[in-house]
Design a protein with these regions (language model features):
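N-terminal basic, low-complexity leaders that serve as flexible interaction/assembly modules and, when applicable
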Residues: 1-61, 105, 296-309
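Active-site mouth loops of central-metabolism enzymes
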Residues: 12-26, 133-158, 254-264
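Conserved, mostly hydrophobic/aromatic
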Residues: 34, 99, 156, 163, ...
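Alpha-helix-loop-beta-strand connector modules within alpha/beta enzyme cores
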Residues: 90-107, 184-206, 243-247, 301-309
């Protein structure tokens, strides 16, 4: 979102879903950061909401608001099969194939991803971003919730399998709304559904990264879900994480730091690198790059990390 070459493409392609389904443009966007920076991996340009879209739910992205979803007809999904699903988002897999075969990815990783079942359930039923809380009556129809979670488990695994078969050699699971749940609800809605996906990815001999954004107990999460790597957000204390868990860790740096100056950026980045110097660690931000970020600051950050000893 912060690269001028991306903005040029985006300005000519207003429909975000159509852009994700254009294998040539989505693969080009995926490769753009690698042309500028010495990165170790590329994450495919797509969206976690491609899954409800592929299941027949209308998904639109409204400027300065976010996603708006229509109704999901659960009755139709009883006859919906893998062929129907894959056909609807096949260009996503074609884009992954194009990216993974590109010379820029030689000796580097191609990251595919999905939304976690809980986060997708929130979008499917809430029909938009919940911001800081979900509706009071969200859990009223437990039968419907369980049915949707079962469907998500089935089709998320199909989505994961197709990404891997087309060249993704890492899968990341984004649980953007995990932090909305109380601790007592995490087992049913986060731990168990995500563990099912993690076990599936591991069965395909591919490493899996999980990002349970906003949760407070990473220790429990890692012990139960057992991701190969856990991503932390910028509200998480990295010193506490180092003491609590043995799992490899990714991320943490607040994207807003990139909007300050180079001296402060270096100080904050080196702080993370020092904290995790004796712990398996993948340097990354604790959330997405902000659109107003200068590419020069990103280049400075990448070089700072690469030069750290």
């Amino acid at each position: 979102r912060y690269l001028p070459e991306f903005r040029e493409i985006r300005s000519k392609n207003i429909d975000f879903i159509k852009l994700c389904l254009d294998e040539n443009l989505s693969s080009e966007i995926t490769l753009q950061p690698l042309r500028r920076f010495n990165l170790d991996a590329a994450i495919i340009f797509s969206d976690i909401l491609m899954l409800p879209y592929a299941l027949g739910q209308n998904v639109e992205f409204k400027k300065n608001f976010g996603p708006i979803l229509g109704d999901l007809d659960i009755t139709k999904l009883s006859t919906f099969d893998e062929i129907d699903f894959v056909k609807k988002i096949f260009p996503v897999y074609k884009a992954i194939s194009k990216v993974s075969e590109n010379e820029l990815l030689k000796n580097k990783s191609t990251i595919g991803f999905v939304g976690a079942p809980w986060t997708l359930l929130v979008y499917i039923l809430n029909k938009q971003s919940p911001k800081k809380k979900i509706k009071e009556d969200f859990f009223k129809d437990q039968f419907l919730i369980n049915r949707i979670l079962d469907l998500l488990d089935k089709f998320l695994k199909i989505h994961i399998k197709n990404q891997i078969e087309n060249g993704a050699n890492i899968i990341q699971i984004f649980d953007s709304w995990a932090g909305l749940l109380e601790e007592k609800d995490l087992p049913n809605y986060v731990y168990i559904p995500t563990l099912s996906l993690v076990d599936y990815v591991k069965s395909l001999n591919v490493p899996v990264i999980c990002f349970p954004r906003g949760i407070s107990n990473y220790k429990n999460y890692c012990e139960i879900v057992k991701p190969d790597v856990v991503s932390i957000d910028y509200d998480t204390d990295p010193k506490k994480i180092v003491k609590e868990i043995n799992h490899p860790v990714q991320g943490g740096l607040d994207p807003k730091i990139l909007l300050t100056d180079k001296e402060n950026l270096k100080k904050q980045a080196v702080n993370y690198l020092e904290i995790f110097k004796d712990h398996p660690y993948i340097f990354n931000l604790g959330h997405g790059v902000l659109p107003e970020t200068s590419p020069d600051m990103m280049e400075y950050l990448v070089n700072t990390v690469k030069d750290f000893k």
